[in-house]
Amino acid sequence: MKTLKQLIFFTAIALFSVSSCQSGNTNKNEVNTAGIGNKIQGDTLILIETPYGNMKIKLYDQTPKHKANFIKLAKEGYYNGLLFHRVINQFMIQGGDPDSKNAPAGKMLGNGGPAYEIDAEFNDSLFHKKGVIAAAREGDDVNPQKKSSGSQFYIVQGRTFTDEELDKLEEKSSVGNYIASHPEINKEAANYRMTGNKPAFNKLIENIKKKGDFKIAKIPDYKRTIYKTIGGTPHLDNNYTVFGELIEGLDVIDKIAALKTDKNDRPIENVKMTIKVIVE
């Protein structure tokens, strides 16, 4: 069963899920290409305490709605005692569901949150390198505006990619975006998916690649460098709002992501969090 706020895996057969890799006109100097962030005077810093160590996060000024909301919830103690309820090795660790507080073992989580969502705040200079924090959300089928959950978030672990893998991702993402932006083609693709007609779907993909208005959106070189060295989850770029990054505690992500989980990706051993604002 698909839960609300559940992050989407992108596979070859799910090309009609939007996953943009457009380069835009980003200034490289705006991006920290070293991977893990550095504190700059005036940054808002958040501390996430866990049984496996602490993570210190700086929140981005470029995403003011998400920044203000996270600060508000942290100050209210909203996150204290909640779980990292969904962890997937080489992908991410997810938390912030209020239903996870004192949840019995085995309970499926991921549907909880405050009674509001946050408008997406995409910024091409903020992308899914290892160590960023981003907002979870409902899927595109019920949330085409990609609004964020009011409380649920995930921290990226990801993995490193080769140039060949990134080339394939560019093509898949570009095809997915093309399908999503053409309603009739989107409807046709959805029909093939529902009926399991893989040959027809594959033929549709090949025809799209031959269209004169189809272009592959390239991943900029500075992002490629990070995805090849530091790692991350490039297929999520411009689909989920990235609103901060770790400046300490990358090893904590790895420890939590490596835990044994149940069939719903919930750690067998509860991983509770405490979140506080330490510099504002």
Segments predicted by a language model, with ranges:
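Cyclophilin-like peptidyl-prolyl cis-trans isomerases
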Residues: 21-280
